[in-house]
Every structure is written in C-alpha cells, then in structure tokens.
Amino acid sequence: MGVDPTRLPSLKNQNQNPNAHIAPNPARLPPFLPQIRPMASFNAAGAGAANPNPNKSLEVNPAPGDAVSSLSFSPKANHLIATSWDNQVRCWEVQPGGQCQAKASISHDQPVLCSAWNGDGTTVFSGGCDKVVKMWPLLSGGQPTALSGHEAPIKELAWIQPMGLLVSGSWDKTLRYWDLRQAQPAHVQQLPERCYALSLSYPLLAVGTADRNVIIFNLQNPQAEFKRIQSPLKYQTRCLAAFPDQSGFLVGSIEGRVGVHHVDDANQSKNFTFKCHREGNDIYSVNSLNFHPVHHTFATAGSDGGFNFWDKDSKQRLKAFSKCPSPITCSTFNQDGSIFAYAITFNH
C-alpha cells in the first residue's frame, strides 16, 4: 500500500465524522527502510498461499525456533537482539549492505520475554519466565551472569542511562531497580497489579498494569508514584510508548485501539484515541508501539500482521504497509531510525 491519508479521529469527533480525510504529508515520512524481520520457524505446508514477506523486508537467519517476544537494537551500533519463547537470546549484526550476520546467543531455562541494552551498547539484559535477570557482556565475549531476579516472570526491562540503573517489571507486582555492582536490587517498588508494559523517556517512566492502570514515575524521585492514570482504553493493556518529550505516553490494547495521553492535567484536551489493526468486524491486538528516534512519528504493529506509521501531532496515518499473513509480535527502530525491525510468528 502507499500513503494512507486517513485521519485519526479524536475522542471529540470520533462518532461525528468517522470518515474524515486530510491530505497526506510525505515530508513527515522518515527514511524507514530497510525493515528487518526475525521470523519464527514454521511449517511451509501449513502457511497457505499467502506471501510470507509482502513488503520484501530483509530476513535474519537463522530464525528463532519459536515466537519472538522482544526486539532491541544497540544504542551504538546496528546489533539486533531478539528474545524468544524457545528460551534463547540471539544477536545479529545488520551490515551496511543489509545482510544480517548471526553473532552470538545465550540461553535461559524458560521462555525469554524481554530485553534491553546498557547505554554504551556493550551489555545485554534479558528476563523471562525463569524469573532471572541475565546480564550478558556481549561485546567483550564474556559469559552471562544472573541478578537475583523476581518471584514471578519478568515482563519488561529498561536501562536508565542517567542513573546507571536497570529497571525490571514483573508479574510479581513489583518494579526492581538494579545497580549492576550488586546482585540484589537497589530498590523494590510495589505495583497495584502485574506489570504488563513499561516505557521510559527519562525522567518519565510509564508502567502499564493488569488492572488497566498506567503508573507514572518521575525517576528523579523513583520511590514515589508521580501519578496513577486509568487507561483511556476499555480493555487489557498490551504496550506503551513514552513520548520523546516526556509529556505523555501512547497505550495500545487488545481491542485494536491506541490512546494518546498527556500526563499534565492542563493538557487533557489534547488526549484522544483511535482505532487501528482492524478489518471489518475483525479486531486485532496492538502488540507494539515505537517512536522514531529522530522524527518522533511512531509505529504500531499488531496481530493482523500489519504495521503502520503515524503522526500524533497532525493526527495522520503516514504509511500503511502490506499485511503479513501472521501476527507481528514486536517491533523496534534502530538508534538513528534508519531501520525498523519487526517479528512475525507462524503457527507450527
């Protein structure tokens, strides 16, 4: 598909003018190509006639053996990490010509759900169903070491560069802050419910919980909640993305809808929600939200196999890509926004 000028309807006009259109703005389209896609292995005989790669994206090999749960690019180089339900953490180097070279991998005892890099791109962190945070000094070739972890699976990780700390969010209803010089957490923050999503734009930390709350922390005072916000969406939170200017966040849910929400009460008139990843009466989960690091437009990816680029300020969909035949489980941009990586999962 080409540029889709469909306007994102605001809460105010959503029912009054659901088919409003405005002209596209190609100047806001960042250089998103190439797209890289780790792809879980699948039975080709069961895949049907649908084109498994309709956007002609580059594919990494060897592919993970099960669903990809997270993707993370190094902040310093085009090194891509994928975590997977096959208990593996894999790294590829995306070379200038577009080739993807497998570099290294490590294992967990159970499925891995999340990943993050440290600020200088030397170390990878991973966590998952074995309840352990692993610290992998990838660039030095060292062996991973384990932090003490959580009492339930670890769903989210983020590196807080100004503080030199790692934060992990778990289904044990806690956030834990880690000083890498010690195995025990520097601070344990209680949450009202299980952590389902987390996004960081320092000093803003947004945490989505199982009760549809979004907990806002000002990391200049991390031991106290700054604000607790009820999600503007009616159903379970799947993903979050903090605004690059720290003024708010995007929230995506299982109902095929995204909320654009500001933290400051004075900006509540700017809040709106919009529908996406729907086809007729079929509604698909929004699985991933990513801001472009330069242009601050954003991407959504969903269980309909589609990914789209949007501009929240002009309320435009900038580009809709051809849908893959299977769900997209996660996605991310590289450090300068020149590469967009996404993972699709085929049923065995």
Regions found by a protein language model. Give the residues of each.
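Conserved strand-to-loop turn within each blade of WD40 beta-propeller repeats
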Residues: 83-86, 126-130, 162, 168-172, ...
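Loop/turn segments within WD40 beta-propeller blades
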Residues: 71-77, 115-121, 157-163, 191, ...
